[in-house]
Amino acid sequence: MLARSIAAAVQGIDAIKVEIEVTVDWGSGFMVIGLPDIAVKESAERVRCAVQQAGYDFPGKKVMVNMSPADIKKEGSAYDLPLAVGILAGDEKINPDLLGRYMLMGELSLDGSLRPIKGALPMAILARELKLDGFILPRDNAMEAAVVNQLKILPADNLSQVVEFLNGTFELEPTVVDTRAEFAKAQGVFPFDFADVKGQENVKRAFEVACAGGHNILLVGSPGSGKSMMAKRLPSIMPPLTLSEALETTKIHSVAGKLPRGTTLMTTRPFRSPHHTISPVALVGGGSFPMPGEISLAHNGVLFLDELPEFNRSVLEVMRQPLEDRIISISRAKYSTEYPASFMLVASMNPCPCGYYGHPKKKCVCNEYQRTHYMSKISGPLLDRIDLQIEVQPVDFDQMSSKAPGEPSAAIRQRVIAARAIQELRFKDEPGIHCNAQMTPSLLHKYAEPNAAGLEKLRDAMERMNMSARAYDRILKVARTIADLEACADVLDHHIMEAIAYRNLDRPTYMGNGVY
């Protein structure tokens, strides 16, 4: 008998339909065709044991499984459940009437219990698009998939429950989540607050500008000056995720298997901080089993690279394209896929190997060659893509011992949200553009042209600091953001001056001006 079950395969962060056809006929053997990987081929023994442990006889005949479309590679053990159900239906142990109305995905253990899978959210979205009656999956993935409205999410604990449900002798209780209530519940809950930061008002201002416009920022300062501490508080002043951004962010983490158990929807912007020993593949994604990398896991959030020069140069250089395009395209011999990568890059570094160049009290022990070599680990093209380059000075004793709290994150966040609202209105007819950092050259000409005095100051700075055309664009974008924070329709000369002041590493007097 021929039986069909419906499953899904993840490509990028979306799912595509996979139809599993099973025939049980005279003969012997178990064969899976349709471009399965090793894990799918190995499922034969897992499925056999799980079926027997569930109390059913595995057919003593020839089992032929075809997974279509045949040109899409089927990876992982999540196909165990649809394979097992298809085999039992082909052996006439399951009523086939309901089988084509539900998507089934889940890994089987040898005792027949269901284990969690990756990518449940995009699969649930696909099931809704296919107008199926529901999605049967492991219980650990139920809350994640239940974010999708207008689809019945049916969690199961083991194979027996699924078989009995399809035969009409057992009811699977649907999992229901109020997506909007879950989304609103956790808004504004952050573990860190800028009120804890003493002093550093210029750095806080730079962070405010960066968040208001979605700009990349680099902090350069001695050890203990508070670079990492302030960077960790950045999500607390970023604008809240929209519902569509939250869904997209959750999809990426679902595909990567990074969602904590029981999570429904990611309601705060991600903050990713990889170690400097990370490989290029781990950063941008890919591998033999394509997975999102750190830059995609930071999508709609922050990618924090602490001690930037300690990262391998090849790792840093692969970020150049996604920093511009906000998407990462991965092409290999056997596949090609894309992952979103619209993140805010926040990096920190010491000014020299010993860390104390420019320190007001401690003496630097590095020579000029060591300092220049240290800075040269960051290429000019990468540095050009960082809009704000800020020197962080150590906090003096009076500020450190002050009992007065700093400005709370909530107050800064309100100004950031107001500036973002101006940008949303400005770019409402520009597809894919949501903030000033994403402006194209034509939009810069339209919205960020400075007044005559500002243009003259920009010309003088460009000539003195020998800045590139990309740096010119970045200054205009930052100046536009500063104007938005003041609710000013025009970009004025003092906006340009403040934006230029954030290009610290471009100064001729800075020892890092030889970065290449």
PLM feature spans:
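Residues immediately C-terminal
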Residues: L110, L303-F304, E310-F311, F397
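Walker B catalytic acidic pair
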Residues: N300, D306-E307, V318
